[in-house]
Structures are given as C-alpha cells and as structure tokens.
A protein has these predicted regions:
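Hydrophobic h-region of N-terminal signal peptides that target proteins for export
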Residues: 8-18
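Inhibitory N-terminal propeptides of secreted protease zymogens
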Residues: 21-136
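Subtilisin-like serine protease catalytic core
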Residues: 30-33, 50, 117, 151, ...
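Structural recognition of the beta-strand scaffold that forms the well-ordered cores
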Residues: 36-39, 89-90, 96-100, 117-119, ...
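C-terminal subdomain of the subtilisin-like protease fold in secreted/lumenal serine endopeptidases
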Residues: 87, 152, 294-305, 360, ...
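Protease zymogen maturation seam
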Residues: 111-174, 187-190, 374, 379
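Catalytic-core segments of hydrolase enzymes
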Residues: 239, 281, 293, 297-403, ...
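Hydrolase catalytic cores
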Residues: 240-243, 262-270, 332, 397-469
C-alpha cells in the first residue's frame, strides 16, 4: 500500500512541477497556421453560356459572370479575414478564397452564413510512372540530340503527319499547359511559345507561376517571372514537347507544331494543391499581365493539357472543388484533357481527380503495338458510385521521344502523362482544320470517341466487357486524327482504312454526317 501511495505522491509532485514550469499565455507559441479553402454558398449561374454561338462572346460571358459573383460576395469576408491577420488569395473560377489561418479561425469562418464549407488545401504529390518499365529501358533511352529527321512512331500511329500534309498543323490554336513548368528556350519549344515573336520575348499573358511558396532548393524558386521547369526529369518540358515541339530542323516531337503554347506552373517539384490547380485554370481561361492583373479572356487557351492527378489521400479531399472548376472552364468552350493515371492493370484504378469526372476527357496509354500499357489505369469509376466509363480513349504513352531541359531529348518518356498531350495536340489539329468546331467541346469529344480505332481486351471490368466497344481498358479506342477529319466530313461516305503493323487493316465506313 505504501508503494502505491508513494507513486501517487510522486505523480502529484511531478504534476505540480510541470504546472509551475508551463509557459504563461503571453509566452505560448502562436497557433499553427494552415492553408484552407473557403467556399462561398453563392456560385455563378453559367447556364446561359451554351446559347451563345460566338466563341469569344461565350468566354467573356463566363468570365464576367464568375467575376461578378466573386466581386460582390467576397469583399466583406476578405476585409474581415485580413483584419484578423489571415493571408487571403481570391479566386473567381469557383467562388472561393484561399486563406492561411489557424484551426480556430477556420472554424469561425465556417460558421458564417455566406460560407458553404471550409476545405483543406494541403499539398498533393503528383503520381508519375518512372521512365523505365524494366532495367534495360532507361539506359536505352537517355538524353541525346534528336535525329535530324525524327518524327516518332507515336505520331505515325495517330496519323498526325497525314493531317500536317493537308495543311493543318494547329495554326491559330492556343494550347494551355498546366504542369511543372517548361524550359521555354528549348529549341523545340521556343518557336512555339506565344511570348516569343522571333526576336523579342514577353511573358505577360503567356506565363504564370502559381507556386508562391516553393520548398527550399526548388530550382525555379517562387513566382518565377519566366517559364521554368522545376521537375528533375523535366516532366513539363516533356509534355510540352509532345504538344507543340518542333525545332524547325527536322526534330519534331509535337502533335501540333503550329499551335501557340502558353503555360502555368501548378506544382512545386511535383507537389500541387487544389488552390494551385485552380489558379492555373484561371490564368489559362483569362491570362494576366506580368503583375497578375488586367485579365484578358480573349487571349485564353483553346485546350488545356493536364498530365497530373490530385488524389483524395494527398489533398483533393473535396472532389466538388476541381469538378466545378473543370465544368466552368468547359462552359467557356475550352477543351480539358486529363491523364487517366498510372495506378496499374486492375479494374477501377482510375480513382483521382480530375480523371474521374464525366466532364473531363480522360486518356489512357498504349504502346506502339496498340497493347494497353501495364501501368495505365482502368475504369470504371467506382469511387463516386457512378460506375461511369473511363478512360474516354487511349493514345501512345510508352517510350515517347520528346524534349527535356535544357535543350536535349529523351526517347523514353512513359506514362499517361505522355498520352494526354497526344489528344490535346489532336484537338488543336482538328480545330485548325475545322473552324466551326473550335470551342464546341461536346461535339469534339463525340467526334474523337466515334473516330477512335476500336480496341478489344480480354479484361472485363464491371458492366463493361472487354470484347465490346467501348470498354474500361481502352475506352472507345485509340486516337486517330485522320479518322476524326473523315468522320466530320459531310461528303458522301468514304471507306476508311486503319492500317497497323500488328494486325490486319480494319475497315470502317465513315458516315455522311458528323
């Protein structure tokens, strides 16, 4: 009994000692600040956009409607937050504020009647498949000058050169690049960067950096005033190369070499946040000057490539945020292409935003023999209970030749990150070839699906048997840009032959009407 009593006495003494040594409230450490997203209840009504036939007028309507609501409803809340010491950044694409505050302040804001909810904005690490599929691939790939007359087999597979031969190379189309940045002075990219006119450069309205708090050691730092790729493997430079790359001397990794490239860095060495992704979508909808002011939706992108994912487990805890953003961008007539992800060969492995959304065009990866890449994520989408079909289609994504910083090329860029820019570039080709289609996202998506080369699989996933088209492995099939042009052509039917080295030619009859 004495032993227990002694222990109680010691505990009481120790507790008293700790109480005497505890800091006073005045010397207590300040509350830990975190990044939060404050979503307001009132959101813009964009239902009138679909009835506006003119592409630029529709975009202006969307931009004005979004900003009218944000300007009217955010001001009182911003004033109060800043008065309390919170750091605040305003967003308009979704009526939302980004704030840095402690938990108590966040809880207080969440109770306000005009606030719908407060969500986390913690960093999200982007999933990338390694370049090497096996130990021999990396050494076979590497970095080197691209051969003087190189056009990759991947471009032959989607039949881009035949579209170029018809005079359609993406001219007049603006391609938006949301990624780790890009090395704008790379010889395959510099001629196609909209900020370079052949002699002088202006990054205003052509480049934006959404990374304002880069981690130590980031080679681009924060708020880079010029396009810079902070990924050690040059991820953004590689995806940009597949979009538009062409050095004018024969090295041409790009699908749409005459398209204009603008860009926004939305990741800090592969780590993004919902707010960074939002900010880049905003810039690509309505680019700003070098100070981030005076937005101009008339200078925005036609198509936005997104070779990244934002997993729920790593930051995208509120799926409605990015979905609403993608929906609003789409309402403005901008085509949004996303990678399916690299989660492997099981069914229902497309699990991350934005690939899971019905309104985002999701792309899986094939190799050069039209076999599905083992890493390419499959559908259907089960994480939201919809069981919807994804991917929409597939494109080459294994051992793709493209650009890497500062001025070299790789022959081994691999992943659905490589597949998505094939489709983004194809949209640029189609919209340069078919001006009435430009800005018509619904009809363009339908055209791409109907004209894809149908591919079958032995893998059944949910309600989608692999021996039917569409299926949850290949979607509607593999991208073919010539097919898309022919399927659009309203002239009498023409027989379409889709040759491929790995199998007999597949014959399809193109319909009379798109």
């Amino acid at each position: 009994m004495k032993r227990f009593l002694g222990a109680l006495v010691l505990l009481a003494v120790a507790t008293a000692s700790r109480a005497q040594q505890s800091p006073s409230p005045a010397s207590a450490p300040p509350p830990v600040r975190q990044s939060f997203l404050v979503l307001l209840r009132e959101q813009a009504d964009l239902s009138g956009a679909a009835a506006i036939p003119d592409r630029l007028e529709r975009r202006r309507f969307v931009f004005d409607a979004l900003n009218d609501v944000a300007d009217r409803t955010q001001a009182p809340l911003v004033e109060e937050l800043r008065a309390s010491g919170a750091r605040v950044r305003r967003h308009f694409l979704l009526n939302m504020l980004e704030m840095e505050a402690d938990d108590a302040a966040a809880a207080s804001i969440a109770r306000r009647p005009e606030v719908s909810r407060v969500a986390s904005n913690r960093p999200a690490a982007m999933g990338l498949v390694p370049d090497a599929l096996d130990p021999g691939v990396a050494s076979a790939g590497g970095r080197a000058p691209l051969a003087a007359t190189t056009v990759g087999e991947n471009l032959d597979i989607i039949r881009a050169p035949q579209v170029w031969a018809r005079g359609f190379t993406g001219q007049g189309i603006v391609v938006g690049h949301a990624d780790t940045g890009f090395a704008w002075e790379h010889p395959a990219l510099k001629p196609h960067y909209r900020g370079f006119d052949g002699s002088t450069v202006s990054h205003a309205y052509n480049w934006h950096d959404a990374v304002h708090d880069a981690a130590a050691g980031n080679p681009c730092g924060s708020d880079s005033a010029f396009p810079c790729d902070d990924d050690s493997d040059g991820h953004g430079t590689s995806t940009a190369g597949i979009l538009v790359g062409d050095d004018g001397l024969g090295a041409q990794p790009g699908v749409a070499p005459s398209a204009s490239l603008i860009g926004c860095r939305n990741m800090d060495q592969g780590t993004g946040t919902p707010a960074r992704y939002t900010e880049c979508f905003e810039f690509l909808l309505a680019p700003t000057d070098a100070a981030g002011q005076n937005p101009r939706p008339d200078l925005g992108a036609d198509v936005i490539n997104n070779s990244w994912t934002c997993p729920v487990s790593e930051g995208c805890t509120d799926p409605d945020i990015l979905r609403t953003i993608v929906a609003n961008v789409r309402d403005a007539g901008i085509f949004v292409v996303v990678s399916a992800g690299n989660a492997g060969d099981a069914c229902a492995t497309i699990t991350d935003a934005p690939a899971i959304y019905d309104i985002a065009f999701c792309v899986g990866a094939t190799d050069n023999s039209d076999a599905i890449a083992p890493f390419s994520s499959r559908g259907p989408i089960t994480v939201d209970g919809s069981n919807r079909l994804k991917p929409d289609l597939v494109a080459p994504g294994v051992l793709i030749p493209t650009s890497v910083p500062p001025d070299q090329y790789t022959f081994s860029f691999t992943g659905t990150s490589a597949s998505a820019p094939h489709v983004s570039g194809a949209v640029a080709l189609l919209w340069s070839a078919i001006p009435p289609l430009r800005g018509d996202v619904d009809q363009t998506e339908d055209l791409l699906r109907r004209s894809a080369v149908p591919l079958l699989s032995s893998q059944d996933c949910g309600p989608y048997p692999g021996n039917a088209v569409p299926n949850a492995v290949f979607g509607y099939g593999r991208l073919d840009v010539v097919n898309a042009l022919v399927f659009w052509d309203p002239l009498p039917p023409r027989q379409l032959v889709l040759p491929h080295r790995s199998r007999p030619a597949l014959k399809v009859i193109a319909p009379r009407t798109p």
